Amino acid sequence: MPVVDQNAIELPPRISEASVADYFALLKPRVMSLVIFTALVGLMIAPGHVHPVLGFTAILCIAVGAGASGALNMALEGDIDVLMSRTANRPIPRGRITRGEAMGFGLTLSFFSVMTLGALVNWYAGGLLAFTIFFYVVIYTMGLKRRTAQNIVIGGAAGALPPVVAWAAATGSLSVEPLLLFLIIFFWTPPHFWALALFRSDDYARAGVPMLPVVAGPDATRLQILLYTIVLVAIAAAPWPLGYFDWVYGVTSLVLGAGMLVLAINVYRHRTGSTALRATRRLFAFSILYLFALFAVLLLDVLAKAVAPLIW
């Protein structure tokens, strides 16, 4: 017969200390903003007319799906986030949200974003969004990040898929153009994140994450940054001579590519001291501008062509 301690204190149920801002932080809003922008470009360059309501629904679902991926990523990485200065102030390491709450939040958003996109737009896009979430959470976060220095290279496919999903939402199919956007983002990802990893290598080493600078060393990472940047510049410029994007995009890609290449060469050349740190930080910052400007030109070109008949 069980013995009941009459003097035991009954603890009240746990009350979550999380605020709306904490749940919003789980969505990784900076990453989400880039996803929204690249997806918008994928939607806008698609042929034909997309009803504004369906277009808005598609972008919203892609954004929510990206946020859901971020929440699930944080739920799965709470143990390493607490060890890294860059992530130690996130809601889970600070104890404001539990990993279980973040997991439930992410799974709920994942379900509704995929189902809404499929039901209201088309299931081709819905399926691609589901695959994107699965790839980021299961393949990258659970499978690759803690096991291989190529985590960013392979996992970068998830971050490159939003414009493909948006194109599929607009057309119900795939074509060369969204695949070109995919390749640009895919080859942009390693130089961008390896530049970050170079000046955050102590963080990754402390958390046991096998980023390339930790596993292969900074010099090998600098070489890989340079090689991937060369490939990126070539792939980003290719759509112009191939006839997919016009000369405005082509010239912009060459100018921006020259900037990326110069900064990548500087990272490769400067290997010690404050000069090396400054070179990696400059490349990291410019890489964000590079991708934004490249996609902005495509978006502005579409808008200009839409407005021109109204003016002339």
From Swiss-Prot:
- Entry's EC annotation: 2.5.1.141
Q: What does the UniProt keyword field contain?
A: Cell inner membrane, Cell membrane, Heme biosynthesis, Membrane, Transferase, Transmembrane, Transmembrane helix
Molecular-function annotations in GO:
protoheme IX farnesyltransferase activity
Location in or out of the cell: Cell inner membrane
Which residue windows are transmembrane per the record?
34-54, 56-76, 119-139, 152-172, 179-199, 225-245, 247-267, 283-303
Q: How does it sit in the membrane?
A: Multi-pass membrane protein
Q: What is its main location?
A: membrane
An example GO CC term for this entry is: plasma membrane
**Single Gene Ontology BP annotation:** heme O biosynthetic process
What protein family is recorded?
Belongs to the UbiA prenyltransferase family. Protoheme IX farnesyltransferase subfamily.
The record's PANTHER family line, in alphabetical order, gives: 4-HYDROXYBENZOATE SOLANESYLTRANSFERASE (PTHR43448:SF7), PROTOHEME IX FARNESYLTRANSFERASE, MITOCHONDRIAL (PTHR43448)
Name this protein carries in UniProt: Protoheme IX farnesyltransferase
